[in-house]
Amino acid sequence: MERHQPRLHHPAQGSAAGTPYPSSASLRGCRESKMPRRKGPQHPPPPSGPEEPGEKRPKFHLNIRTLTDDMLDKFASIRIPGSKKERPPLPNLKTAFASSDCSAAPLEMMENFPKPLSENELLELFEKMMEDMNLNEDKKAPLREKDFSIKKEMVMQYINTASKTGSLKRSRQISPQEFIHELKMGSADERLVTCLESLRVSLTSNPVSWVESFGHEGLGLLLDILEKLISGKIQEKVVKKNQHKVIQCLKALMNTQYGLERIMSEERSLSLLAKAVDPRHPNMMTDVVKLLSAVCIVGEESILEEVLEALTSAGEEKKIDRFFCIVEGLRHNSVQLQVACMQLINALVTSPDDLDFRLHIRNEFMRCGLKEILPNLKCIKNDGLDIQLKVFDEHKEEDLFELSHRLEDIRAELDEAYDVYNMVWSTVKETRAEGYFISILQHLLLIRNDYFIRQQYFKLIDECVSQIVLHRDGMDPDFTYRKRLDLDLTQFVDICIDQAKLEEFEEKASELYKKFEKEFTDHQETQAELQKKEAKINELQAELQAFKSQFGALPADCNIPLPPSKEGGTGHSALPPPPPLPSGGGVPPPPPPPPPPPLPGMRMPFSGPVPPPPPLGFLGGQNSPPLPILPFGLKPKKEFKPEISMRRLNWLKIRPHEMTENCFWIKVNENKYENVDLLCKLENTFCCQQKERREEEDIEEKKSIKKKIKELKFLDSKIAQNLSIFLSSFRVPYEEIRMMILEVDETRLAESMIQNLIKHLPDQEQLNSLSQFKSEYSNLCEPEQFVVVMSNVKRLRPRLSAILFKLQFEEQVNNIKPDIMAVSTACEEIKKSKSFSKLLELVLLMGNYMNAGSRNAQTFGFNLSSLCKLKDTKSADQKTTLLHFLVEICEEKYPDILNFVDDLEPLDKASKVSVETLEKNLRQMGRQLQQLEKELETFPPPEDLHDKFVTKMSRFVISAKEQYETLSKLHENMEKLYQSIIGYYAIDVKKVSVEDFLTDLNNFRTTFMQAIKENIKKREAEEKEKRVRIAKELAERERLERQQKKKRLLEMKTEGDETGVMDNLLEALQSGAAFRDRRKRTPMPKDVRQSLSPMSQRPVLKVCNHENQKVQLTEGSRSHYNINCNSTRTPVAKELNYNLDTHTSTGRIKAAEKKEACNVESNRKKETELLGSFSKNESVPEVEALLARLRAL
């Protein structure tokens, strides 16, 4: 009683001395002990009756029925033993928070304590007690299962213990609302420092309910203050001190599971922490990187992505690399900062599940300078730093180990460019990726050779490649971290599609343009022809005028109207009428020469009327209509007279009556640009036909003008045109062509030349009748001159046909002979191939077995064309065909049958031979030889000394007959071989031709080879799927283990210990236990690696005990290590749907498959022992294995 007496009387507060208090004085004294810390007016406690010395105190009871939620919170805030250090006083708190109500609740509790508790009320209080003790669900569960009496005793013991240890007697605690009010004041001086320090102590010492009460609103205020301090440009000492204090408060808040979850759920919390990473303030940076490390190891993959996103944003804002500040922290002299930075690096590098991503993060740290710093860090003597460096090196070796196994056990130092190139080349060589890889290297050579620019190019390319190769399942985490090069692959694909369409349209446009050019050229040629016709019309009109002037005009009643003018007689080709003849009559003077064709643009063909003949004097020619007057003072345009025909400019002209007074065309004066050089250049560039330039240009111009008026005498216009084209292409004098034909000069005679001559020359009768025109040679046009020269050659057409046959004979032999040899070789190989015979036997067995009970059962043979139908026979599950099954059987049991693919290789060429065409060409060759022999017999003796036709052709006939006889014999032998094959395989000649027979066999050979490739791909896919499945299972187990480890890190060590969550995480980081635990793997034996390699040759399976193997075969279980004599096949689980494109570590897979590979070796030994027993037992036929497989289909 005496030790409680000082707490019962407070004279300073106006209480009467000796005034007694209720019997629950100890608990009330706890509340009263807080009064001296309160500022402002104080209220004395209510008076109470005196306490008699020696009076027995009533038992402490609590009536829960009357408690509100606030009262329960206050009750749950009772501190258990082991309290933390006291907080410093909070300055300048308002008195509004001081109230006498703080003791009302305990007083009421004490007064109502004797009332009994209901079961629900006590259970509610029990839950509040466990929550206050910061117990997780796993530890709460066994406590909830205890008896009600034990729960009641635990609650009472908890209250009594708290009251005896004085936690109920401490001074009044500052409420969360008071801290929140102070933080809202917005102060940024020493007062804020004191407030934050007091808050840190309160967050550390108060129970979870107090922390939760503050965290609802206080966390946002702390983040607002931190954001304000970071965004401010003031670098004062007090600002950085406040910033550090805020981070310490966040650390204390994160020391509870509630606080840690709230921090990780806040979007801006990680971003602000990343911005607070500043090597210039080592102490603050140490706390920041520790918090980030803890978040990385305790969160899921999404949290890691958010941390990296925060670091990236901070780096972009500072215009530095995102890991620059972390690496700079390693350069600082503070060992604690170096340890914390290595913890964060290990947390970032070891947390991702994907190997590629771990390598990417590690390599980025190395590029930022970590590679140069690591040797210096290893020289520092510090246990904590040594642990972090050891973790970094071990995980680096593990990742390189997994990477090497993924690349088929190729171990190389990836820091050397030559080794990396060889590794990449070995993966793409002889694949479709080879061309793209070479293209990439070629494009790298196009980078501009500049010292500064080249570095930026390679940096940009490296960032692009890193984003592309890390793209997985449409979501690449690095896309979020590298916003500067955020590639929208969907848009890129759309662009590629549009580009493909554009190329297609451009190709069509190019084709249309070519057609347009052809049509345009034809149009220009047509216009040139029209101009020639116009010139001819003008010439005829001039002759008509001369005729009229000589013989008089037509009678007056003979009026032949001319076609009307389309332009009202304003065409520029119209000439003014000449003066009329004298009235006395007589012969008029000759008219002026006809005008030349107009220049392009002066008028279109037929744009004006044909000028009428000048009227005679006695017909009254004075009444011709005058020219129309041009509007707006326009003057007639100058009439140009080019010397040659020009190409036309197809424009739509504007007529004068369509213009206005202010029109541009009224004022133009194009004549100022006229000069002789321009017009000559224009004429030479756009003329319809180029003039041939020779030494004497003037003489040639006269000749060309003279040629234009030459007319065809005897040749048809079409023949003449074709001969003109022929002569213009060869440009050889006519006599020289004649001598080449007479001498049969094969060095100068071309096959195309002879073919054109035969095609375009007139027939022999016309040639014979041209001798009468020899005297008029100079007046003939070029084609007629050429024909006259060639008519001197006797029997020209038979001669040309014989020369053409001689020129083509060697080519015909080279075409016929290989075809005959291909068919003959194919027939021989088909008949003598043992592997092909075995294949037919195997197919016959399978077919008879499958056709059992049908009309096709018990077949003795089948048409070889039926081999092509094997691929049409599907399995029961529609996943394979009989052809693929046959290939698989041959691979497993009869590998020598596969050799028939090489034996029948001549079928590839033979199937392309048309025997009918071959025979036709051979017969035609024989007929041409006979015809040539007859020509030589009846050929007249040569009249010209240069005529060597008979001599050369006689020698050619002898040689050609020998070659023809050889070909005939080869063809006869080919037919005999084919007839032998037809009889050998009982093929109906009437129904199956040689072409069909060879084509069917070649198609079967091609599909058989394709089935081999498809089976290989199928096995690779199955093995890959199995490796992926094993890797996924292993990764899932590791993920669950990591989750359990993270869960254990968040738990308390013992039930009654209140060690913080963040303290446990930091302790795990410091010891290295928090990082990924990837077990060490040893390389597998070479033989096991080969057996598991997807590219290795599949070995032949041994004979199995099929009496016990009656389980239906599935497509996904055809690997050789799944089939053994003592095991049945397990169907592949169809519900598993894995993405085979994911980059799962092959090293992890192979390490997991090592045990299975050992089982494979043991199964092989059992199969070997079983083989011995089968070899002794001859009653088991060898085809039982095949029949068992057939039953499965």
Swiss-Prot record:
Q: Where is the FH1 domain?
A: 561-631
- For the modification Phosphothreonine, the affected residues are T68
Q: Where is this region: Disordered?
A: 1-57, 558-622
UniProt biased composition (Pro residues): 575-600
Keyword Lipoprotein annotated: no
Q: Does the keyword Lipid biosynthesis apply?
A: no
**Residue interval(s) of motif Nuclear export signal:** 1184-1193
One GO MF term attached to the UniProt entry = microtubule binding
Q: Any idea where this protein resides?
A: Cytoplasm; Nucleus
Xref: InterPro entries: ARM-like, ARM-type_fold, DAD_dom, DIA_GBD_sf, FH2_Formin, FH2_Formin_sf, FH3_dom, Formin_Homology_Diaphanous_sf
**In what residue span(s) does the DAD domain sit?**
1057-1087
Which residue numbers does the motif Nuclear localization signal cover?
36-60
Q: Which residues form a coiled coil?
A: 497-554, 1013-1056
Kindly list the positions at which Phosphoserine occurs in this protein. Answer: S26, S77, S175, S624, S1093, S1179
Q: Which disease is it linked to?
A: Auditory neuropathy, autosomal dominant 1: A form of sensorineural hearing loss with absent or severely abnormal auditory brainstem response, in the presence of normal cochlear outer hair cell function and normal otoacoustic emissions. Auditory neuropathies result from a lesion in the area including the inner hair cells, connections between the inner hair cells and the cochlear branch of the auditory nerve, the auditory nerve itself and auditory pathways of the brainstem. Affected individuals typically respond to sound but have difficulties in speech discrimination.
Q: Which family does it belong to?
A: Belongs to the formin homology family. Diaphanous subfamily.
Role of this protein = Actin nucleation and elongation factor required for the assembly of F-actin structures, such as actin cables and stress fibers. Required for cytokinesis, stress fiber formation and transcriptional activation of the serum response factor. Binds to GTP-bound form of Rho and to profilin: acts in a Rho-dependent manner to recruit profilin to the membrane, where it promotes actin polymerization. DFR proteins couple Rho and Src tyrosine kinase during signaling and the regulation of actin dynamics.
Domain free text? The DAD domain regulates activation via by an autoinhibitory interaction with the GBD/FH3 domain. This autoinhibition is released upon competitive binding of an activated GTPase. The release of DAD allows the FH2 domain to then nucleate and elongate nonbranched actin filaments.
Report the protein name in the record: Protein diaphanous homolog 3
> Which species does the entry assign this protein to?
Homo sapiens
Its ancestry begins with: Eukaryota, Metazoa, Chordata, Craniata, Vertebrata
Q: Which gene encodes it?
A: DIAPH3
